[in-house]
Amino acid sequence: MPSIDVSLPLSLRKRAMLASALNLLAVFASQVMRLGGNLVITRLLVPEMFGVMAIATTVAVVLQLLSDVGLRPNVIQSSRGDEPLFLDTVWTVQVIRGFVLFLLTLLLALGAKFTQYIELWPAHSTYAAPELPMVLALSGFAAIIYGFQSPKVDVAIRVFQQKKVVIAELIAQFVGLIVMLVAGYLTRSIWSLVAAGLLSTLVFTVLSHLVFQGPRNRLRWDPAALREVFDYGRWILLSSSVGVLAMQGDRIWFGGSMSVAELGVYSIAVAILGAIQSVLLRLAGAVALPAFSEATRSGDKERVRSLYYRSRVLFDLTSLFACGFLLTASPLLISWLYDDRYAGAGNTMAILSLSLFTLRFTLAHQLWLALGLTKYVAMDNIIRVVSLFILLPVLMAIGGVSYAIWGVALHTFFTLFLIFPVNRKLGLLDLKREVVVLPALLIGVFFGEMITSLFT
């Protein structure tokens, strides 16, 4: 079976470094657009609209992850990841999944309308917002569009040829940004957010077929490839199904206990923090996973171990510094960026920034995926969701929403009881290296305090 022709003239290290630099530039440009658009649109729309959109986004993410069988990681990790028949099998599964997700979203939209009709929710609840059912229905169409995205994008990531990926993503985001701002200015409605999301997804899907190297995708599948997809993806499916509750459980829970405006303010804090998280997650998925996978296929365990800890340096220093800095400087940053309606997001973001302490172990998850040890990723997510859904109701009962936010920030710390033993078993635990980076946290706290003192 012929493969897609991709040349690899550079060493793994050089290709990973180039990919890292490219992705950092891409994330920076993306976050500038996102933050700039966010600052403008929050002045055009009222906080309640962001609360409704937060629920719609949560529903979309939940459904995506509940049906996630790891198609992209499979393409990146598999020895068959550049074979046209294998890629067509992946694409066919992805298309079918998109239609199924859209139908499920429509059912949830009808369910939301019915619960409003019988007045199941308190009048102040986000779930009682009259726009919610239609926002859900229209936003769900993005699942169909995304389903047609070409797996040639995944091949480009697999071999570190990511320039086109970055350009396509930025073009799609820019189109969505322009649509959001123009429609927001003209209509002052939540539909500007919905339209922006749909058009951005459509643009990237079209570009994925037009600009990436490889034969045209066809709807077909190979039984052997299909078995490999589901054998690899079964633990990822469990992991994602459980992990989605950990990732989105706070908004699901707060949707019933916060007012629409409060959830809108909370979503602003989550979005700003998410901008930092996305930098690390982007590098993990687009650089670390392909690098770990290639090193793993070589069979050199010492090379894998060395690559893991070299990669950890940037992640550890960045996440620990950001954790300390935002812990002390978040209220000031929010006061600079937003008007008084969003002031409450400052203290919320300060608390949530503690989650950055454990985000640095994302690289362990990527290494487990590269080694095919997807069951450990599933176990990690099980710990997250159990911890979150124990802490949320307990802290809510003790001190209300303000206490429950601490549960969102701290629930990931329980995963360390899995990460350290597993990495020790794999010969990847070096306590000296784990400890030596911790001063970056204190340096971040110091800089945050210093800037806050200077400007308040």
Predicted regions and their residues:
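Short runs within selected transmembrane alpha-helices of multi-pass transporters and secretion channels
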Residues: A26, S30-R34, N38, A56-A60, ...
